[in-house]
């Protein structure tokens, strides 16, 4: 069995090595010739999977995408061919939620404007939006959710209209899929008019898809509104973001919000489980077998952390400032965006860091944030 796999997908060899011949490829430049003999194709969001790519292949059984979204895959075409498809919904949700939360802590520190007391509006209450809300609510932050699709489906959570969210939120975090047509179109959901209407001193964080915000309009608005603070992990025109926009972002990164070691391993592992199910063989490998030990054994707390101390703990796990600095230095270089993604260091999730606390105060909120080992 030939398994063609994006070369940037981690843990493929230990998971799939016993199942067939692994053929690593560049996912962004993948050609029909490279997949014409594949039995299994494993991709990320940079690969367009459609008839043009697969028409020469008559033996493909399974396509797996280690992503939450599926907009890069022609699902209808795969169905007509009888090709089984699986993605990895939620695989990097924790990573994205923690990224957005850390970004808010960093902005709070940079502008001496505490996160506690602010209202955060989350647009899109799926896996990543829910993970962001979980972090915020654990820290005692009021969260407003907007997701008309989930609301219509009967999701029991409380939702508000986008207009209400824009009026009441001090921070907006975007977590919607890209939808180009229809009643709930998200393409340029934040156009020039909507960006100009945002309340004063708003923080806007985009961790979903670059073209949910009209980036050209965002440049124009930022030229007029210095009070609008931006954290951008995604960009229109990836892998070539508009260079004029980068200086306007407080933190800028190359679409790596979901790039935790845990999240990346989880995505590959979910595809391994699905392929084993398709092949009717037992999944003998475990996710816990893949992850290395964290380089900090534990942090002993003499007292529970305030907001500034929490940021220091978060930086033990992930320092957003480092990725921001690398991005500004490299994004304009040839293939810089993709090189940064490929060479992204092994960021961990909060769960990798154990905290030891023996005081009498309530510690559940630290556990709910995801830190491990919290106890009295």
UniProtKB/Swiss-Prot annotation:
PANTHER family: FORMATE DEHYDROGENASE 1
Coiled-coil segments on the chain, per record: none
InterPro entries in the record: D-isomer_2_OHA_DH_cat_dom (IPR006139), D-isomer_DH_CS (IPR029753), D-isomer_DH_NAD-bd (IPR006140), Erythronate-4-P_DHase (IPR020921), Erythronate-4-P_DHase_dimer (IPR024531), NAD(P)-bd_dom_sf (IPR036291), PdxB_dimer_sf (IPR038251)
Gene name as annotated: pdxB
Documented EC number(s): 1.1.1.290
Protein name in UniProt: Erythronate-4-phosphate dehydrogenase
Active site feature: 209, 238, 255 (proton donor)
Family: Belongs to the D-isomer specific 2-hydroxyacid dehydrogenase family. PdxB subfamily.
